[in-house]
């Protein structure tokens, strides 16, 4: 009965999260409408081949996915091949992460993948570059099947450009032999606990903009305005931003803190020298194996600034599957992209890799809600900040990484924190040409 109530509670959280994420973001093109509109028209009129009813016999599709997806990708593509005997299909697999898809495609779109996975913050950039093929296959179905926020993340100027398949965010894993459920509500309480000389209490990747932003958002900071659409606004260098910088300086200096680097958290969790670490569902199986019976996952903790507890608010975005506008096989490419992002493959990813679904039906499945990592992701999503997808977002990552690195190496101090934050924000808001 207790388990049933817990699952029902998580189901209610999922419903609220889907609704709240859908409502918290306006159309990502409320600025620069003229430019975006012209670029979209150019992409549609000149760069995008017309879909035809001609069925090619021989079809070769280049498909990109990250390294950790390669095994299951091949299984899914073979299933697609079996289901489509009208094509003589050959697949050319490539290893490109979702984070790097836009960069690699812009080098030479014609040499890029026909079908590829990418992070939703790249949507506007890829559309403006004329690289994404406008989706015309079963638009009503994918809109009805997936969380509204995931559809918004794949949409530019009311046109869907990709198929969503998973929320992309992070939360906290912990060793429940070292922390109680009450302990993990507060990072300050976690760091104050004496777990032994050789044990690090907490780890997060501070020199990574995807992670460090959570601390600024927790204290009321905004990136590109309240709704992420203003390329001229970032408040990370205001008074509250300085408070965050001071908190990060203290955290980095704490001997109980471990900066995440090259997945060093996995070995530390396994040998018992780390009590809690931040990551996503992509590491769920490995961390579960490392922690064994002590495996637990939850939302991010609160941090205490000026005597007040502030909830860490991570970036929330989505992983999408798109089609190259220069593909020679538009219809088969869209069919494959739809299948790879569809309910069957989302379920397969969940079962084999603990990847959370965007499919509404799967998101409410009791097996999904009973999974600790997926449940933690769902809970944290209610505290998350939807990641901006405007082109200016591309300017954020390097300055944020550099600031985090300087916090770690000690060159950011409480005396120069304001100047260092000013430098970071000026770089973030600099013209992208």
Regions found by a protein language model. Give the residues of each.
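Extracytoplasmic "Venus flytrap"/periplasmic binding protein-like
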Residues: 79, 83-146, 177, 182, ...
């Amino acid at each position: 009965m207790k388990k049933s109530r817990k699952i029902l509670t998580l189901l209610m959280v999922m419903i609220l999260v889907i609704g709240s994420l859908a409502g918290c973001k306006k159309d990502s093109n409320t600025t620069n409408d003229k430019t975006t509109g012209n670029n979209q028209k150019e992409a549609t009129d000149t760069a995008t081949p017309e879909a035809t009813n001609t069925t090619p016999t021989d079809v070769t599709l280049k498909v990109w996915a990250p390294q950790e997806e390669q095994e299951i990708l091949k299984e899914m593509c073979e299933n697609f091949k079996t289901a489509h005997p009208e094509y003589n299909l050959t697949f050319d697999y490539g290893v490109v992460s979702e984070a790097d898809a836009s960069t690699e495609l812009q080098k030479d779109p014609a040499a890029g993948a026909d079908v590829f996975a990418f992070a939703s913050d790249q949507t506007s950039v890829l559309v403006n570059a004329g690289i994404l093929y406008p989706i015309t296959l079963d638009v009503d179905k994918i809109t009805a099947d997936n969380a509204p926020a995931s559809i918004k993340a794949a949409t530019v100027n009311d046109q869907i450009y990709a198929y969503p398949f998973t929320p992309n965010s992070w939360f906290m894993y912990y060793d429940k032999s070292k922390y109680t459920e009450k302990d993990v509500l507060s990072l300050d309480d976690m760091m104050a606990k004496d777990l032994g000389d050789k044990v690090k209490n907490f780890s997060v990747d501070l020199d990574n903009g995807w992670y460090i932003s959570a601390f600024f958002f927790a204290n009321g900071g905004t990136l590109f305005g309240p709704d992420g659409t203003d390329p001229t606004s970032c408040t990370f260098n205001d008074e509250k931003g300085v408070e965050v910088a001071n908190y990060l300086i203290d955290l980095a200096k704490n001997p109980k803190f471990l900066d995440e680097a090259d997945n060093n958290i996995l070995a530390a969790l396994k040998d018992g020298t780390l009590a809690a670490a931040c990551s996503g569902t992509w590491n769920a199986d490995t961390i579960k194996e490392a922690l064994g019976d002590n495996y637990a996952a939850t939302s991010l903790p609160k941090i205490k600034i000026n005597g007040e507890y502030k909830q860490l608010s991570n970036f929330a975005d989505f992983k999408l599957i798109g089609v190259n506008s220069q593909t020679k096989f538009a219809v088969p490419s869209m069919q494959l992209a739809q299948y790879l992002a569809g309910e069957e493959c989302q379920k397969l990813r969940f079962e084999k890799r603990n990847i959370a679904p965007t499919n509404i039906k799967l998101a409410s499945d009791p097996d999904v809600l009973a999974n600790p990592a997926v449940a933690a992701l769902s809970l944290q999503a209610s505290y998350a900040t939807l990641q901006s997808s405007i082109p200016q977002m591309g300017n954020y990552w390097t300055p944020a990484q550099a600031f985090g690195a300087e916090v770690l190496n000690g060159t950011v101090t409480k005396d120069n924190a304001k100047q260092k934050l000013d430098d970071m924000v000026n770089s973030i808001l600099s013209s992208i040409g």
